[in-house]
Amino acid sequence: MSAIYKLSIQGIRSFDSNDRETIEFGKPLTLIVGMNGSGKTTIIECLKYATTGDLPPNSKGGVFIHDPKITGEKDIRAQVKLAFTSANGLNMIVTRNIQLLMKKTTTTFKTLEGQLVAINNSGDRSTLSTRSLELDAQVPLYLGVPKAILEYVIFCHQEDSLWPLSEPSNLKKKFDEIFQAMKFTKALDNLKSIKKDMSVDIKLLKQSVEHLKLDKDRSKAMKLNIHQLQTKIDQYNEEVSEIESQLNEITEKSDKLFKSNQDFQKILSKVENLKNTKLSISDQVKRLSNSIDILDLSKPDLQNLLANFSKVLMDKNNQLRDLETDISSLKDRQSSLQSLSNSLIRRQGELEAGKETYEKNRNHLSSLKEAFQHKFQGLSNIENSDMAQVNHEMSQFKAFISQDLTDTIDQFAKDIQLKETNLSDLIKSITVDSQNLEYNKKDRSKLIHDSEELAEKLKSFKSLSTQDSLNHELENLKTYKEKLQSWESENIIPKLNQKIEEKNNEMIILENQIEKFQDRIMKTNQQADLYAKLGLIKKSINTKLDELQKITEKLQNDSRIRQVFPLTQEFQRADLEMDFQKLFINMQKNIAINNKKMHELDRRYTNALYNLNTIEKDLQDNQKSKEKVIQLLSENLPEDCTIDEYNDVLEETELSYKTALENLKMHQTTLEFNRKALEIAERDSCCYLCSRKFENESFKSKLLQELKTKTDANFEKTLKDTVQNEKEYLHSLRLLEKHIITLNSINEKIDNSQKCLEKAKEETKTSKSKLDELEVDSTKLKDEKELAESEIRPLIEKFTYLEKELKDLENSSKTISEELSIYNTSEDGIQTVDELRDQQRKMNDSLRELRKTISDLQMEKDEKVRENSRMINLIKEKELTVSEIESSLTQKQNIDDSIRSKRENINDIDSRVKELEARIISLKNKKDEAQSVLDKVKNERDIQVRNKQKTVADINRLIDRFQTIYNEVVDFEAKGFDELQTTIKELELNKAQMLELKEQLDLKSNEVNEEKRKLADSNNEEKNLKQNLELIELKSQLQHIESEISRLDVQNAEAERDKYQEESLRLRTRFEKLSSENAGKLGEMKQLQNQIDSLTHQLRTDYKDIEKNYHKEWVELQTRSFVTDDIDVYSKALDSAIMKYHGLKMQDINRIIDELWKRTYSGTDIDTIKIRSDEVSSTVKGKSYNYRVVMYKQDVELDMRGRCSAGQKVLASIIIRLALSETFGANCGVIALDEPTTNLDEENIESLAKSLHNIINMRRHQKNFQLIVITHDEKFLGHMNAAAFTDHFFKVKRDDRQKSQIEWVDINRVTY
């Protein structure tokens, strides 16, 4: 089941476009509180937009995005990101991106590509879709609810929250979408369409069934004719039976002769069996001798070698581990050398770049020197290489020209200063005396008043600041300045500017390329007719090639055609028609040869039937003897051993006996070792062989138990009992070996007889099968010829025709291409308008990506600039605070000084007034004369100084640039070249060390491989010891068999066999004569059989599977008839099911509405409310419903729309949405209530809160139940007792920039 758990908002409505706000949704309750206009509803709008892709009501024209007029930006990017769990438990993230561009007079709203990402259990992410339309369809599917439920129920907008009481047409539209009525209507329409199409198919099937019935009747007539011919063949069979009775008498005599053959055959059979056994063992001896290294050792010596082999393997393993440790240390050293090499390569690159800058600076110095010389002629003829001398002379020239300016200014300054001093003294004297005269009269009373005020202020003054607070603020100011300096040293903004400039350059290059493609498209359009013609020809060529490919695929892939006319993948098209003509001629020739062979084989077949019966009698007697021996063996063999398994069981028993004996010997050999290992394990808790401590107690206890078992005395007794049991069982098997040999001898005779019988049968069968094969071949050849005529020849002719047309089209394409190449100068060759536009479209996509990157970089730069500004402003605020504190501290001292000074000044004023009045008149006359002289001197000074200052500024600017570059050149000459050479040498030394280390590593690796090979050879050596033991045993068995063969009397048995063969030949000659007479009769039967075969062949070809086809078509007809009937039944059942589904859902909805209304509504005027669904009509397309919300007052039903208050509307709408959510939201238990208390009085608010509390309480254990409540009323949270379900709520507020922010708040901070 699905659930949502995190939402991120950026640039939506009042949410800042530069910062991202995030909210996490809990279970079972998420609370969002905030004042009106803070941005609470925006959260619901973002949830709805993320899940459905629908914008909120009345938000066209980009008003859903943060207003660019507020930020002063032209491009606003907004993003909504929702993290949720899908209905199948998969973690997913959906991202929606939108953009608002501000132009001069209008704004442009764009929906950008989004993203739907799935996250698996290991954290790997996979993008499922990026297109907005696909997201609109896929997100509701992953949430497990239809889009209508998300839009009208789960994330219903506040403006649309009263939709259950909207006008009837709007209400019907929304309920039809919620019930998905159109989906079921389309299903019914599809069923009706299928039924209509099937009616047409039924008519055609009826015609086909009638035609097949006629062919079925003809087939029955032919079968009757075949039956009559078979009757004649049966008459001939009776005559053949008399001849066969005589043949049976000969067969009985042959059987008696065969019985006399048994005695000598037993001896020969036993000899033969011994020879076969000898041959088998000899093969094993030879195989082992060739596959192993034979050791010239006795069997005991080999067994001792095998027992001591494990210690050698252990030593080799220890040696191999030491080598691998050496390799590991060499690899670590190689890694450190590689790291050093990388750092040296990086430093070398930096120094080489510095060297390149050094060369450029030297050239720049030469250019600056020439420019200076050309402009000021202040240098001597110095070579460009002596830049130190150039720098020295420039410095001297700079000092000279600066001194000249200084001298001029000083000269005028002295003269002007003298005159100004005189004038200033006069003016100052006049001003001072006048002001003193005027102010001193006023200041006396003012000073007295100020003194009094300062005295009062000093009394009431409070120390607002101390020296400690001043020191604290100074420390903060120093910290912030250091942070600013650190931030500026990182050069973040210049780096971002550089990236933006690089991307802008790329964008300019791409725009130029797009313009070039646009020019090519325009030029291409000028030859539109030729390009159009070329496009049609290319299309025709592709069509012809497709047809040729289809013909080629049919010729190569059709199994029937491939058998007749095989083609390779690399066949020559030009030779195809000739190859077919050769094939057709060969077919005609093969048919003629096949007919000739059929006549010859028909004659041979009649002579091959008489050899079968004699051999069959011999088999019967041998079978009886075999049964007696089998009965004897069955009575004496053990229950777990059958006759067929005797040799395998005997071999397995010998092997088991040998294994048991070896186990006993091995136990006796290793008993002392196991006792020592047990002692060490119990005492030291370590392995006796490798001395390693045990990993844990469980491993130790397991090993101790195993060692105790092997050292137990009962264990040896068990091994001895096993050896004795195996030995007795092996002896009982060997006692029956002679009967097995007898049985094998009888089986061999039966096999020989069966071979003779099979040979005779094979002769007859071969003749018959060859004749049948030739008949089949004849039919096959005729079918192949017919296939070649009817199917292959038309394909070959069409292929040849298409090849010719394709060649003509290619010539036309080449001609037009050559004509177009005159106008086309592109390196890419001739391209059509569509091809050019496709490339231009790809470039436009790249351009959009570049612009997006530039926009992102610009946004990052702006953020960094704002961060810098905030830091600077903070420093200024701290400086102001420090200044204010310092001013406050000094203020008290200043007041004391001021009071004292003012009192002294009051005494001096009275004496100065009289002196000032007389002196002012004399000073005014002297001032007028001095002012006239001073004005003339200043005009002359300004002209000369302005000209010289301009010259000095130009010289200083050029010389400063020269000296800066010169200092960089000198620094690199002093340090850069030496460091570059040192780095190169160190890099070469490092490479040599790495090469030497690699050689050592290769040498060690070869040693490891050699040791591993030796270890593998050791395993082979162990295997070789075991196989040498096996070879000694086989040779012993071979000697025993040879002695047994030499003991038997073979010569007498062979003489008896010769007599038997002579008598058998006489009987066989007589048998063959009778068989020849019998063959004549069989020949006549063959002719009749040929007629039957001809008729049968006609049945197989012309009327092949006629009854099956008739039955198939008849069944198809009946099936389709039944299907149409089933479709009618299914349509009615579906319609009925839809009605039932609709009725049940409406019952559930109304039941929940009734319960919630009665628990919530506190008024007495409305008893309850319901949703009425009235059936409109039963049209061709199905039933339709109208919906309305009704209320009950004293059992009277009334339409609620237009008859209820605003508060009742809100409450009814919330209850209906809750009911719909519980009914249709099984897979997605989320529902959001935006301002549910709107228009509700206090009592109904409290009732609604309690109802929500009960709903949460009932569904809190449902894993995916999530109730989201948005409200400005914190009392509502108290009525809900929200603290019982969550420990926090989210507060939405505006910051000082009026941007919306989401804040996590403890639920206990709510004041009810």
From Swiss-Prot:
Alphabetized PROSITE patterns for the sequence: ZN_HOOK
Major enzyme class: hydrolase
Domain Zinc-hook: from-to ranges: 640-741
Phenotype upon changing R1201E: Abolished ability to mediate DNA repair
GO CC terms in record: condensed nuclear chromosome; mitochondrion; Mre11 complex; nucleoplasm; nucleus
Catalytic activity: ATP + H2O = ADP + phosphate + H(+)
Keyword Chaperone: no
Effect in UniProt of substituting S1205R: Abolished ability to mediate DNA repair. Abolished ability to promote maintenance of telomeres
Cofactor: Zn(2+)
Positions bearing Phosphothreonine: T568
InterPro entries: P-loop_NTPase (IPR027417), Rad50/SbcC_AAA (IPR038729), Rad50_eukaryotes (IPR004584), Zn_hook_RAD50 (IPR013134)
Positions that bind ATP: R13, N36, G37, G39, K40, T41, T42, I65, D67, Q158
Single Gene Ontology BP annotation: telomere maintenance
Binding positions (Mg(2+)): T41, Q158
Comment field (misc): Present with 830 molecules/cell in log phase SD medium.
UniProt family annotation: Belongs to the SMC family. RAD50 subfamily.
Domain notes: The zinc-hook, which separates the large intramolecular coiled coil regions, contains 2 Cys residues that coordinate one molecule of zinc with the help of the 2 Cys residues of the zinc-hook of another RAD50 molecule, thereby forming a V-shaped homodimer. The two heads of the homodimer, which constitute the ATP-binding domain, interact with the MRE11 homodimer.
Protein name: DNA repair protein RAD50
Organism of provenance: Saccharomyces cerevisiae (strain ATCC 204508 / S288c)
UniProt gene name: RAD50
